[in-house]
Structure formats: C-alpha cells, structure tokens
Amino acid sequence: MTKPNGSGDSKNTLYCSFCGKSQHEVKKLIAGPTVFICDECVELCMDIIREENKTSAIKSRDGVPTPQEICDVLDDYVIGQRYAKRILSVAVHNHYKRLSHAGKTDGVELSKSNILLVGPTGCGKTLLAQTLARILDVPFTMADATTLTEAGYVGEDVENIVLKLLQSADYNVERAQRGIVYIDEIDKISRKSDNPSITRDVSGEGVQQALLKIMEGTVAAVPPQGGRKHPQQEFLQVDTTNILFICGGAFAGLEKIIAARGENASIGFGATIKSGEERGVGDTLREVEPEDLQKFGLIPEFIGRLPVLATLEDLDEKALIQILTQPKNALLKQYQRLFDMESVQLTFTPEALVAVARRAITRKTGARGLRSIMESILLDTMFELPNLRGVEEVVINAEVVDGNAEPLYVHASKSQTEAG
C-alpha cells in the first residue's frame, strides 16, 4: 500500500495497512495480496491471542475447573489410571477452591492436601503431571528429587524448586504462591539405612528434612539468580503455604514390603513371589499403608506432609495398545506423521500392535519402553525410505516386530508412477 501524496520517493514507500507506519519506521513489512502488515502489529496480534488463550482455560461457573473437566482433559492424553485421575482432579479442584476462599473471613481455614503418587515405572505418573501443566491456569513446575541435596553440599538446594516455580510465574511472587509443584523420583530420597545415626545422608533423609518446611508452608528466601554462585544478591520472599505439592515415585521393592506385611512372613520366599505373580505390582501397591512407606525409607514427618495417597496400576496389553493408538499425541500417530512427510503411509496390523505391547510388558518398562521398541522396529525403514522411489505404503506385521521378517513395501502401480 502506497500513499499518493508527497514527493516521488514517498510514492514508492510502503506502509502498514493496520498502523500506518512506513517501511522505514519498522523492522519488517510483510506483504499480502493487497495489504501489508508490520512486525510490530504481528507482535501485538500474538500478544492478544496469548491473552485470549490464557483466559479461555477451562473454568466452571465460579471460576474453578470442576474435577470432571480436569479429568476429561487428562483422558485425552493419559490412558487408564481412572482412580489416580480422580484423586488428582479432586485435589487440583480443591486447590483452586482454597485459593478463591482465601480472602473470606468466616473463621474456617482450609488447609492444603499434598499428594503422593505411587506406581510402577512407565505407568503414567510423570505424564499426568505434564498434562496438568498444559491445562492449569496457575504456575506449574516439575523437579527431580535425585538432583537435590541438603543445603551446603554439592547439588541443588530445595529452595531451587521454589525458584523454578517463580521463573514459571515470570517472577510474579503472588502468582507463584498459588502454584503447583510436581517432584518426580521421590522414592530416590529414601533413607539409605534403618539407623539414622550411622552417617550423614545428605541426598536421602537430609533432603526429606529440608522439604518438610516448604511442603507444610514457610516463607522461603529464594535467590533470583540461582543461589550459591551469587551470594551478594537480594533474596525474594515466597510464602509456600498455598503451593500444592505432588510427589511421584516408582518405589521399586515396596510391593514386597506390603506382601510380607499381608502374609505375616518374615522370610517366606515362595509366598511373596506367588502373590506378585498372581496380582501384579499395581494391585499390591493399592494396599500400601504409611508404615510400609516408613519401612521403605521415608521418615514419618515426610509421610505426614502427603495426606493424599494415589496408587497407579500396571499397564496391561490392552492399555498399552490404546496408548500406542488413541491419545492425541499417540506414538503411532507421531510415526505416521513422520512417514507422511515422505508421502508414505505407515500401517501397523492389529497383530503387530499386540506384539509391540507384549515386548513392552516383557521388558517391564511400561509405556516408557514403547518408543524405544518402535524406534528399533522402524530404524532401517526410516534410514532407507528417503532413497526409495515409488513406495506409497509400509506395512508392519507381527513377524516384523518379532524380528523374523522385513517390513512390506507397497509400491505405486506403474501407471501411477509414470503419471507422477
């Protein structure tokens, strides 16, 4: 768009159709069929869209997402685990309600209920937390318990968790104080010995002790630049009273402690193994009691800070097939998209999907092992495919998954190839 008035130079000058600035006043001018838009207007549009996305987060009539709404979104990405989803949905819903109730002076103070997720590896604990992060309108951060140590030792301080939450809230202290923290691999900070006085356990019991206060509620002094490297910086004061903590861990071996308690067996090899085979890890974990967690290595005070306990189930063959095919970000859909980019259709037969699920069960890696299995099956095909001509479909059957056959390449007919 040019403006007709002015000197000869101005006739050739282009202007933004929205704000009217010339090409010399802005960094870039993007041309459409009959209009132009400058980089500043594009940025403004993006800001407007971002704000609209924030305000369009799931809300019920009183501004609090209902447990059903939260659970429905979790269902889009996480297969199974109905019991754990319901517990998480109610806990997050109540967290929102506590925040909206905070200013009311009716004498009733609502305390938070932190959550402990217990389940076998690859059953969806971390994915549940990541999916929650997508749908919540409060700051959310994930931390790895294995990197934490007591203050004064090499490693991360527990205050770094609050710092990460503060960063996810763009250093808005008030928003960070209403956030949710997920601490993964919490079972890795169990006490290393039944006798706490033998030696100082800086990455086990020491971390549990350090987490107690921030989980219950304290004013944490958080260094904005990350702590030990900048000792002279000013500290930000963050009140953790209203921060919801969700902890998750596989707790490998906990099922044996539960089984031994249930059968009153101090040694009894056969009985415990038989119980495990008949019921599976997930079924056994459902009977977990605080005393079992204490025997595993969590201190009683730490267990007391996690009043809500949710156990996750083992993923069976049917659930693993659903994980491969059904969610919005299903693994099979991802690989099919990669093959689409080469104009090739990728097809897994129903028998092949069953074989993939069985391999994952044999490996005992749960859903986490599915990607490595798929990668090993399709590696050679993905290597060769860009150099092949006329291939329109690749078919994977059970024999291919088991390593007894090569993938089937379906070529376009001669007439189609010539037409192409």
Swiss-Prot record:
GO CC terms, sorted: HslUV protease complex
Database matches in SUPFAM superfamilies: Glucocorticoid receptor-like (DNA-binding domain), P-loop containing nucleoside triphosphate hydrolases
Record bears the keyword Heme: no
GO biological process: cell division; proteolysis involved in protein catabolic process
Disulfide bonds: none
GO molecular function, one term: unfolded protein binding
The ClpX-type ZB domain, residue ranges: 4-57
Pfam families according to UniProt: AAA_2 (PF07724), ClpB_D2-small (PF10431), zf-C4_ClpX (PF06689)
Residues the record lists as binding ATP: P120, T121, G122, C123, G124, K125, T126, L127
Origin: domain of life: Bacteria
PROSITE patterns cross-referenced by the UniProt entry: CLPX_ZB
Binding sites annotated in the UniProt record for Zn(2+): C16, C19, C38, C41
InterPro entries in the record: AAA+_ATPase, ATP-dep_Clp_protease_ClpX, ATPase_AAA_core, Clp_ATPase_C, Clp_protease_ATP-bd_su_ClpX, ClpX_bact, P-loop_NTPase, Znf_CppX_C4
Family stated for the protein in its record: Belongs to the ClpX chaperone family.
Subunit structure, interactors included: Component of the ClpX-ClpP complex. Forms a hexameric ring that, in the presence of ATP, binds to fourteen ClpP subunits assembled into a disk-like structure with a central cavity, resembling the structure of eukaryotic proteasomes.
Function in brief: ATP-dependent specificity component of the Clp protease. It directs the protease to specific substrates. Can perform chaperone functions in the absence of ClpP.
Name of the protein in its database record: ATP-dependent Clp protease ATP-binding subunit ClpX
